[in-house]
Each structure stands twice: as C-alpha cells, then as structure tokens.
Design a protein with these regions (language model features):
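Non-catalytic signal-transmission and effector/linker regions of two-component phosphorelay proteins
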Residues: 1-7, 106-131
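The feature encodes the CheY-like receiver
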Residues: 60
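Short amphipathic alpha-helix used as the core "switch/output" element in two-component signaling
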Residues: 43, 65-76
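Two-component/phosphorelay signaling modules centered on CheY-like receiver
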Residues: 15-33
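Acidic, metal-coordinating helix/loop segments flanking the phosphotransfer/catalytic sites
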Residues: 34-52
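Active-site residues of response regulator receiver
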Residues: 56
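Acidic catalytic/metal-coordinating carboxylates
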Residues: 37, 63-66
Length: 131
C-alpha cells in the first residue's frame, strides 16, 4: 500500500535552519510546514495533521520539552523528535527521540523514517485489533 508523502512540522526560531530543514525534507519525499514560535506551532498542531514533529529545544520563552508535553495533550499521535545543541540529559515521555544539531541530514532522515514507520505500524495493529 502506497502512503502519501509524510507531513512534518518543523519548529525552530532559527529561520535559516528551519528553511534548510524544509528543503532537505522536501527533496527527501516529505512535506514540511514551518513554525518559529511555540504559539504558532501549537495553533498548527490544533488545526492540522502531522506524521511527525521536529522541535528545537530552545524556543523564545519556553523549552521544547514543555512544548512537546502540550502537543501530546492536544494530539498524542505524532512522534516528536527534539533537536538540541547538546546531548539530552533530561528525558520525557512526550519525546520519541532526539538529534543533536550538527548531525548530518541522514541521521535526521533515519530518525524521522523510523518514527513515522513505528507510528504507522502501531496504527495498523490497532486497526487490525479492532476487527
């Protein structure tokens, strides 16, 4: 069964990084929406469906962990991948995985594909169990 292009929300206050991420994802077969603030991202999560969310750890006035927890209360389905400048010591159930800024695009793509694949597999198993 063919799936449509996965839809990703990338949240980062660094516009250049966010635009570069969108370009890499677009070339790699993803549709990517951009948000630059927590407020903008939460509004987009409420109104749109995403297969995964990329989330910068540091956002103006808040942290990615806080935003991830709010996202999970609004829409618990999409896996959240935290993008951080250093190895993450703090853990949260709201985070599927994380990548370190500076890791190559192949790591980002591998983590995104794995997270989306796991989510789709779980949804298929839930659908089969409901028969």
């Amino acid at each position: 069964m063919s799936h449509p292009r996965p839809r990703v929300l990338s949240i980062d206050d660094n516009k250049m990084l966010n635009l570069m991420r969108q370009k890499v994802l677009g070339i790699s077969g993803f549709d990517c929406d951009l948000a630059y603030t927590a407020e903008q991202a939460l509004a987009m999560v409420i109104t749109s469906h995403y297969d995964a969310i990329l989330l910068d750890y540091y956002l103006p006035g808040t942290t990615g962990l806080s935003v991830a927890q709010t996202v999970k209360t609004i829409r618990p389905g999409p896996p959240v991948i935290l993008v951080t400048g250093e190895e993450l010591l703090e853990r949260s159930n709201a985070i599927h995985s994380y990548i370190v800024k500076g890791d190559g695009p192949e790591i980002l793509l591998d983590k995104l594909k794995a997270a989306i694949g796991q989510r789709r597999e779980m949804k298929s198993m839930q659908a089969a169990a409901s028969w």
